[in-house]
Amino acid sequence: MDAPVSQYLKSWQFPLTDYPTEKITVRQLLSHTAGMPLGDFTNIYSPGEVMPSNRDVMTDEVVLMREPGTRFSYSNTGYNLLEILIEDVTGQSFSDYIRTEVLLPLGMESAAFDIDEEVTPYPPTGYNLRGKPVPVYLYPSKASGGLFATAHDIALFALSGMKENPVLSGDSIKLLYAPQSNKIGVYGFVFESYGFGHYLEKLPNGMLSVSHGGQGNGIMTHLQAVSETGDAIVILTNSQRSWPFIAYILSDWAQWRGFPSVSMGRIIWGHYGLCVVIGMLVSASILVILRLVSTFYQQKRARFRLIRVSAAFILLGILIWCACQKYLFITSVFPVLSVWLWGTAFVFSIVLLLSVVLPACPRKKDKL
């Protein structure tokens, strides 16, 4: 767990980076504390299409962002490095090894990393953040999100984390759920810490709840479990707009099973909060427009001009920055409301600029 992974890598080596890669360990990779980047999860291919190898992708994407072991930063590339590590240590392909050593022993017989037209049930078409259809696709890397599985398969996986089984011993399960990082950035809004492959939270009744979601182009999934009671829920959706929907389901599930609450339910309050912010921006825009109209014949617009210009350019700068990002957490969580937020913020900034730029029209009596 704590030995440098570079000691075991035979078929791939780290590209040049500003930080010491020889310090990266399996513990850090499993807990997203190795300083590695998120990775490009939009790099997708159709079944049967020629695609680069995981090693080629890793060579392009692995540029350490910070000193290994310093802080949490969710990283798909970290798990894809574990894929290479498993292949180099076992001499098998990652897909074959995981199927033999994990999937089949747990009874996940229909789960697979590869897919063709004969697979049943065939995965449904997904729908992205804009509501456009996304046909079934594959990633060059498997470990971070390349598994095709049914709700029944994932339920069996959830059960494996509740009691000793052919894959995990009791001690391994305890280690799996031991907090590795308590400062988890924006994820701290709904979770307390991160273990190995699971987000962790203490419920109000003192029980430990573990969870993890999955997101890709056109899909959104979530697994939540409470080992002490044997409860778990698996949610698989073919829409990338599903987080608010998932939050409502989890809130209802917790109430049904007698849990006080689960923290993912906070997304519901975030949804309401964004509605309030959008309403405030709309109201502010209307007020500025009304004031602009009412003072059209008055030369009194110099007051707070610098503040209005500054606020407008700050808003526009933020919007431009957001538009340049490949991935935004808020857009992922609130895909519909975020569009309204950007739109109302843009309108408000333009209205502020107009309130400064448009000249006041002198009254007729002033002309005389």
Per-range role (PLM):
Residues 2, 6, 95, 154, ...:
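Internal amphipathic alpha-helical segments of the cytochrome P450 catalytic fold
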Residues 2-17, 106:
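Short, glycine/proline-biased beta-turn/loop segments that scaffold the active-site neighborhood
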Residues 4, 16, 42, 53, ...:
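Alpha-helix initiation/capping motif
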Residues 17-217:
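Short, surface-exposed loop or secondary-structure junction motifs
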